[in-house]
């Protein structure tokens, strides 16, 4: 049954919140366990819908998956199946990350084109091109990515764009290829570094993680391991932006602030007081936020996943902000819902110009994806009256205990069955 959130605006948020493991990391780590026969253990798994969905994908490939709280125990078989069917894959985008491990381990893969968030075109061209350079035949056939290889051999691979997904799929195939693979213009996101750390624990030889050039020396086989997922920087930043919007005071634990330096700098520019430790940060906002300009870019730039929250912040800031989207072209669909809440915003190509108002007005709004949903809830926190946020299953895919955490911070929000 469909559910919605009812958010009553006007409360100042304060307190402490701890974030769990990163959604953008755990799903790739789960897929990587297919590379080694035996049982791998992943800890600090977030309580989000996409984790059991990925578990179903892996079970369909012959793995045994046990989810126990924040622990996932995954036993990969000696001969995994190579066909990830549409029923399991269609529900979320990250399911395509089994492509690289299957090509690496089975030398063949058939993965249905994935579903997921409606934030614009995210083609698999770079994934396919990279796998072809490693020696695989890779094409789209009947709605599936189909790859076959006699052997995989290392190659020099130049990515047109530092795509996270392409970097990860190429990486997970290259770790068991013959010879040396170099990925130029590789994605530098902390989630990619986390994957490299786990692969090296499994016996891979990956150098340069977190830099634009990654070197992978292939090994014959990998072994199972135990690994702890890094903290979710996107969830953590969402709480920091919530503090700034509500003129609140929130301490966020369980995340490395080094993964969020540009975001925290922007919050400082908006007038917040930001303090940091090795594994936490605190955002305190006393006055109305100041307008700031934001341009999304691959890491270490401002994350595209936080663009909706940046627009929500700009909508009540003092002044006019320009938000530029350089990653996903359709992410500005969110602006239409913000206008329903009274925001003074307009889009022009990949720019959104937002003139801040003292307060938004409540209205029914609809989530189109995980981050847009979170942005709408933050907007509801500063709107006059009760805002109804619909299609909140999107939010549940990326934010563990979202309502419970908001309530603990002083928000007035409830989940209602429609």
From Swiss-Prot:
The keyword Ubl conjugation applies. GO terms for biological process: cell division; cell wall organization; peptidoglycan biosynthetic process; regulation of cell shape; UDP-N-acetylgalactosamine biosynthetic process. Its EC number is 2.5.1.7. GO terms for cellular component: cytoplasm. GO terms for molecular function: UDP-N-acetylglucosamine 1-carboxyvinyltransferase activity. The active site is at 117 (proton donor). Keywords: Cell cycle, Cell division, Cell shape, Cell wall biogenesis/degradation, Cytoplasm, Isopeptide bond, Peptidoglycan synthesis, Transferase, Ubl conjugation. UDP-N-acetyl-alpha-D-glucosamine binds at residues 93, 305, 327. It holds the Pfam family EPSP_synthase. Its main location: cytoplasm. Pathway: Cell wall biogenesis; peptidoglycan biosynthesis. PANTHER family: UDP-N-ACETYLGLUCOSAMINE 1-CARBOXYVINYLTRANSFERASE (PTHR43783:SF1). Belongs to the EPSP synthase family. MurA subfamily. This is UDP-N-acetylglucosamine 1-carboxyvinyltransferase. It comes from Mycobacterium tuberculosis (strain ATCC 25618 / H37Rv).
